[in-house]
C-alpha cells in the first residue's frame, strides 16, 4: 500500500529508471531519485517496497516514522531507511517546508552496510558537514538519464560514497 500527498513546488524533480540485469548485479543501484521542495502538507506512507531510501535534508525538516522509531531529519542530516518495513515520512510538524534529496537504492552492498547504518534497525540520522552529499545527489540525478557502462559505474560509486558519508 502506498499513500501520499505530493505537496511540492514545481521545481521539484522526480526521476525513475528500470535497472538493467547488469545494474541489478552491482552492489549499489538506484530505481528512483529526486529533490523535493516539499511544502507543509507533503507526506508519504507505504507498507513495503523492495529497496532502501536515503534522505538528505537541505532546508527545513522532515519527520520519519518506522515502527516505534520517530526522528526529525533536520538541515544537513542524512538517514537510511529500509523500505521493506512499513514507514511514513512528511514535512515535520511546525515546519512549512522540507527541501530534501532522496534516492531509492538497493543491492548487496547496501544490505551488507545496513547493520552499520541502522544499528539495531533503529532510525539513526547522521549530521553531515560540507556539500559532498549534495554533489553526489546531483551527479546521481544527471547519470539517471544515461544507460551506459560509465553511468552504471558512476552511479554505483556515487551511492557507495553517499553511504560512506553516513
Roles of regions detected by a PLM:
Residues 70, 84-109:
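Ligand-binding loop in jelly-roll beta-barrel domains
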Residues 117-122, 139:
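N-terminal helical cap/lid subdomain that shapes the substrate entry/recognition surface
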Residues 106-112, 127-166:
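An amphipathic alpha-helical interaction segment
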Residues 1-72, 77, 88, 121-124:
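Generic protein-terminus/edge-of-domain signal
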Residues 44-45, 112-118:
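Short, charged, solvent-exposed linker or helix-capping segments at domain edges/interfaces
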